[in-house]
């Protein structure tokens, strides 16, 4: 299911979960993802990312504050909550791929947001603007190409 499917399935979900469920680092801001598939998929949302690569949560909300999806992960499990539905996956990578059509390297994302050069095959992060709260990363392979742009601040 692509982001459009997540959005349609999510509708106007209300927030759930407990604040601070995942300890570690925290960021918030806006993200956009473009996957050059056929047809092209685009998605943008406000986000809150908390935790560490091994266990954390990502909450996506619309500009007017409706929760679009909540992603929670821990070793061996990843959950996608949207509305009253919960879908389970074996890993956060499988969860992200099912939701977006592209594997976004969550482990590396934590490093990139912290300004660390984390190497991921096929991905090219641009960390030149991280100090100003901007990150861009492009996935060249495998196809389709994906472009991730994030404007963020530490939460």
Predicted regions and their residues:
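N-terminal export leaders
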Residues: 1-3
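Bacterial Sec signal peptide processing site at the extreme N-terminus
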Residues: 11-27
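Mature, soluble, non-transmembrane domains
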Residues: 13-14, 87-155
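Post-signal-peptide N-terminal segment of Sec-exported extracytoplasmic proteins
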Residues: 27-68
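Short polybasic amphipathic segments
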Residues: 31, 76-81, 133-138
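Short, surface-exposed charged micro-motifs
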Residues: 46-48, 68-70, 77, 124-127, ...
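An acidic-aromatic
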Residues: 55-105
């Amino acid at each position: 299911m692509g982001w459009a499917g997540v959005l349609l399935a999510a509708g106007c979900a209300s927030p759930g979960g407990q604040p601070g469920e995942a300890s570690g680092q925290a960021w918030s801001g806006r993200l956009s993802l473009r996957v050059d598939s056929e047809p092209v998929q685009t998605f943008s949302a406000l986000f809150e990312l908390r935790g560490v690569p091994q266990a954390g949560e990502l909450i996506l909300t619309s500009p007017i504050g409706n929760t679009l999806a909540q992603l929670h992960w821990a070793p061996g499990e990843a959950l996608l909550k949207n509305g009253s539905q919960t879908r389970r996956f074996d890993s956060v990578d499988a969860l992200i791929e099912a939701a977006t059509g592209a594997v976004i390297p969550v482990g590396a994302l934590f490093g990139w947001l912290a300004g660390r050069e984390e190497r991921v095959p096929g991905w090219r992060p641009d960390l030149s603007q991280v100090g100003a709260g901007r990150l861009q990363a492009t996935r060249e392979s495998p196809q389709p190409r994906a472009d991730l742009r994030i404007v963020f601040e530490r939460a």
